[in-house]
Regions:
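Conserved RNA-binding domains used in RNP assembly and mRNA/RNA metabolism
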Residues: 2-115
Length: 115
């Protein structure tokens, strides 16, 4: 069922200050803790131990890129944001740039210099 979505013609989109931020999808293998509080069945633990760790997909505004991790925010405003998601580089399977741009850290530094 691959139907094309027809969109109405729209006027030119206005630009916003945070349009300069890079947006990225990160596919990564997460760590996992399996079991409940208290004692757990050893057979269930052995069965779960053989299963691969879950593959996760995160999309967000790139806040910072370091040698050790990528930091993303899913939502950002002028002075508030969602929770920060830090993904260790060793867990990352794929990075896809959805919108090229700068990190929030670089963006804020540039704004300070321009003032």
């Amino acid at each position: 069922m691959n139907e094309k979505v027809n969109s109405m013609p729209r006027s030119k989109k206005p630009s916003y200050p945070l349009d300069a931020l890079q947006v990225m999808e990160v596919v990564w293998q997460d760590a996992e803790e399996v079991g409940d509080i208290g004692w757990n069945n050893i057979k269930d633990a052995l069965k779960s131990a053989k299963k691969p760790c879950p593959i996760m997909h995160s999309i967000g505004y790139v806040i910072n890129l370091t040698e050790s991790h990528i930091a993303l925010l899913s939502t950002i405003g002028p002075n508030v944001c969602s929770t920060l998601e830090k993904i260790p580089r060793g867990w990352i399977l794929r990075e896809t740039i959805i919108r090229d741009g700068e990190t929030l850290e670089d963006h804020r530094e540039q704004q300070k210099r321009e003032r």
